From Swiss-Prot:
UniProt function note: Recognizes and hydrolyzes the peptide bond at the C-terminal Gly of ubiquitin. Involved in the processing of poly-ubiquitin precursors as well as that of ubiquitinated proteins.
Phylogenetic classification of the source organism: Eukaryota, Viridiplantae, Streptophyta, Embryophyta, Tracheophyta
Record-given protein name: Ubiquitin carboxyl-terminal hydrolase 8
GO terms (BP aspect): protein deubiquitination; proteolysis
Ranges for region Disordered: 615-650
Gene name per UniProt: UBP8
């Protein structure tokens, strides 16, 4: 479209038009000026339908428009509308004339109007009518449309058949952008306006399009007052550079130009800039974990190109491992919504519903792990988009001494024969797994694919624990002990550390227990249980026991003493638990008398000297006063089901020590242990000792009651730091398999705890790195807060690749981070995304704002997304 000033002479304009090699042109003219020119026309030459369209400024430009050539030089955006829809007011048919309204006229009409306007006289020359109506031409030349969303993404080619008409082209455009047809208009700007549709059933005139024609597509986002526009700011050397940013206050739609050009033009007022893809996701209720992963994937370059194209052609509806394409379609629709012009915030309800349907673990509104969602989504997208319709059977063969390169290529060919999708193309790599049998030294080499690397954090591998060690023969007092164990180790690691710390002789063994409220609540006997089951506030007691060839059962002694409590002014004697339980074996115990003698032997180390005991009769111990404030483990005398308790209280102050059979918690009394009564030695014996006041005074109960916590609460440790390369080296370090993950050795024909070694073999285009900050157990979850120092612009992995298989580069650039703040279960997820130039953005659910590059490296980094650099 060309424009000239209304004040120019018709002759000069004619000469200018002739210089365009005879091509027909369409002109924007100000509507006020056009109305004045119409007034000068002869009435028989004026037809209302000669003004086919109007053009209203779609940007926020509000200045005067005096000269047409100045208008076009300012890169102002216009919306085109039919005259009948936009210009007529009511039944009068009068046009509403505005200083910002324009008419779209043919070159013949433009020349005649200039003459009438300048000469102010009638002309004899007929006016050529210009209309979009007429006979439909149903054929077009073969044409290729190039669609692009941002300059940093590759353009998308859309093939249109020669038999396709303009209606089919219109429908194709609607399908590509997932828009309703009434929200879209197409017209030809190749030299003469011949195609103009407001619905997919409109007819067109003069559809003989040229092969190099350019189709302009306008997308109008209804219900929104703001659009996102981009402009190409001109450099001094004449080249263009795209500027990114968010611009508010612009009305109307965003115009995209599709044609043979590889670049995408976004027209807007000078100084206005914006960008696509900076769209937040609403938090539907603890869905920040999902939003974080989705934003990282939605800004993965190759995936953006793929899902903005005709990806539905690759959906595999028959894959039994897939989800009938529903996850891929839901993700594709969501990604298009995030990249739609004018979008501000998107509510991912449809996607979450699909997710909950196929992955019930993510249903509801509980907090989950963003990496677990990412793993499920990548696997689900792969299966939904798997190009392999019928997977062939392939057998995994061992290397058997063949060259690694040959075996690796064989494994990869077998993998791709069954798994071929955009996810495999972009996100999957391959590592080498070597297993060595510790017995026969058999070596097995396999090559497995990976979607992401889960790296441990080696700097936080040790944990300090405080415990109390008790003798099982009364030979020594309780001993406090501190040991260092692997933070994610097992109970057997704790046992080994205790054996070393105690210098344990061969004839002794250790029993590790957890004590709470003066009773043993747990025996830590399973060697494969995780040490994460032990919390910092727990109290652990270790008993040194003699090894017994007959494996005699244990006998556990719990203690109670009688206290006077005053309730509502009345005295109420109550039994109160105190002290650490004492443990021994039943190997030399036959009757009740032996049970009592063994108990007194275990207490012998707590007996105070005679002179201290005499002095203490006149001055009550501090421990007695302290015990009165502790009400845990109390039993009312009146509530007990022992018939001897009342006799005991009535015979004060001269009672005797009594022993009772009880349960493992010391809550109920089964029977009193009589001295001559035989003891059942077939199972563990739980004994409750009830002490008379006078006899208890001869023992130092303070030593019996003091227990340290595993780790003192409130002590703040300095934050640890580690480099990403150290994490990678820990991942690649040789280590033995666990007892629950043993390998079947083909040489020994037995399951063995083989030595395993991993090596990187083939790296993907998109490298996803998962930092293993979280550990899970049956009872608790832990998070590591260590700061991981990772490179931004140049992650060079060339020194970690076992085989250089012709790949040009092993360098990567960071483009997204999934962050987790806070503790497990109550934390919050966000995403940092690199989006054009050197800009980083913080995606915090529906809030999106720019963040400086210096602030993106934090201890909250959880999943890192890298893209391969091209040399």
């Amino acid at each position: 479209m060309n424009g000239t000033s209304p004040d120019e002479s018709p002759d000069s304009t004619t000469q200018r038009i002739d210089s365009f090699n005879g091509e027909q042109r369409v002109y924007f003219v100000p509507l006020r000026w056009w109305k004045d020119a119409q007034d000068s026309m002869p009435s028989e030459s004026v037809e209302k339908r000669e003004i086919l369209y109007t053009a209203s400024c779609g940007s926020s430009y509000g200045g005067p428009m005096k000269l047409i050539n100045n208008i076009f030089n300012s890169d102002i955006l216009f919306d085109l509308r039919r005259e009948g829809d936009a210009l007529q007011n009511g039944e009068t048919g009068e046009a509403s004339v505005s200083g910002r309204d324009f008419a779209l006229v043919s070159s013949d009409m433009w020349l005649q109007a200039l003459k009438w306007y300048h000469d102010d006289k009638n002309t004899e020359k007929g006016v050529k009518s210009f209309s979009a109506g007429g006979v439909d031409r149903g054929d077009v030349y073969p044409v290729q449309l190039r669609l692009s969303v941002l300059q940093e993404t590759n353009s998308l080619a859309v093939k249109i058949c020669k038999k396709d008409n303009s209606v089919e082209c219109f429908r194709r455009a609607c399908k590509i952008f997932s828009l309703d047809s009434e929200q879209l208009r197409i017209w030809d700007i190749s030299g003469q306006t011949t195609l103009f549709f407001e619905s997919d059933v409109s007819n067109s005139k003069d559809c003989q399009q040229q092969a190099d024609q350019e189709i302009l597509l306008e997308l109008q986002i209804y219900g929104l007052s703001d659009s996102i526009k981009l402009k190409e700011s001109k450099k001094e050397d004449g080249s263009t550079q795209q500027t990114n940013g968010i611009t508010n206050g612009m009305n109307g739609g965003t115009v995209f130009r599709f044609g043979r050009s590889n670049s995408l033009s976004f027209l807007g007022k000078a100084g206005e800039a914006g960008t696509l893809g900076l769209t937040g996701l609403q938090n539907l209720g603890n869905t920040c974990f999902m939003n974080s992963s989705l934003q990282c994937l939605a800004h993965t370059p190759k995936l953006v190109d793929f899902f903005l194209g005709e990806y539905s052609k690759e959906i595999n509806l028959d894959n039994p491992l897939g989800m009938k394409g529903e996850i891929a379609l839901a993700f594709g629709d969501l990604l298009r919504s995030l990249w739609a012009p004018g979008a501000s915030t998107v509510a991912p309800r449809t996607f979450k519903a699909k997710l909950a349907r196929f992955a019930p673990q993510f249903s509801g509104f509980n907090q989950h792990d963003s990496q677990e969602l990412l793993a499920f989504l990548l696997d689900g997208l792969h299966e939904d988009l798997n190009r392999v319709k019928n997977k062939p059977y392939v057998e995994a063969k061992d290397g058997d001494g063949r060259p690694d390169a040959e075996v690796a290529d064989e494994y990869w060919r077998n993998h791709v024969a069954r798994n071929d999708s955009i996810i495999v193309d972009v996100c999957q790599g391959q590592y080498k797994s070597t297993l060595v049998c510790p017995i026969c030294k058999k070596v097995s080499v396999m090559f497995d694919p990976f979607m992401y690397l889960s790296l441990p954090l080696p700097c936080t591998s040790m944990r300090t624990m405080d415990l109390t060690v008790m003798s099982a023969d009364g030979s020594s007092l309780p001993i406090p002990l501190t040991v260092n164990v692997p933070k994610f180790g097992k109970f057997e690691d704790l046992h080994k550390a205790l054996v070393t710390a105690c210098s344990l002789p061969e004839e002794e063994t250790l029993l590790v227990t957890e004590v709470y409220n003066n009773r043993i609540i747990r025996f830590l006997e399973e060697p494969t249980d995780s040490l994460t089951l032990i919390r910092d506030g727990d109290k652990l007691v270790v008993y040194r026991l003699k090894k017994d060839a007959n494996n005699s059962p244990l006998i556990v002694y719990m203690h109670q003493k009688l206290e006077e409590q005053f309730i509502s002014g009345k005295s109420s004697p109550t039994w109160k638990a105190f002290g650490i339980p004492l443990v021994s074996r039943l190997c030399d115990v036959e009757n009740g008398s032996d049970v009592e003698n063994l108990y007194l032997k275990l207490l012998s180390s707590f007996k105070m000297p005679t002179e201290f005991f005499t002095e203490n009769l006149e001055n009550p111990t501090e421990e007695e006063a302290t015990d009165k404030t502790d009400t845990d483990g109390t039993t009312s005398v009146e509530d007990t089901n022992s018939t001897d308790v009342k006799e005991t209280t009535e015979s004060l102050p001269d009672p005797v020590l009594r022993l009772y059979l009880t349960d493992d918690r010391g809550n109920s009394i089964e029977a009193e242990m009589l001295k001559e009564k035989p003891v059942n030695k077939s199972k563990r014996l739980n004994v409750l000792a009830r002490w008379p006041v006078k006899e208890l005074d001869v023992y130092d109960t303070c030593l019996l009651s003091s227990l340290p916590e595993v780790s003192k609460s409130g002590t703040k440790r300095p934050q640890e730091s580690v480099s990403l390369f150290k994490c990678l080296e820990a991942f690649l370090t040789e280590e033995p398999l666990g007892p629950d993950d043993m390998w079947y050795c083909p040489g020994c024909k037995e399951h063995r705890q083989a030595i395993k070694k991993l090596d990187l073999w083939r790296l993907p285009e998109i490298l996803v790195i998962h930092l293993k900050r979280f550990s899970y157990s049956r009872f608790m979850k832990n998070k590591l807060e260590a700061y991981v120092d990772f490179p931004l612009d140049n992650l060079d992995l060339s020194s970690y690749i076992s085989y250089k298989n012709g790949q040009t580069t092993y360098r990567y650039m960071l483009y997204a981070i999934s962050n987790h703040y806070g503790s497990m279960g109550g934390g919050h997820y966000t995403a940092y995304v690199h989006h054009g130039g050197d800009r980083w953005y913080d995606f915090d659910d529906s809030h999106v704002h720019q963040i400086s590059q210096e602030k993106i490296k934090t201890s909250a980094a959880y999943v890192l997304f890298y893209k391969r650099l091209v040399d």
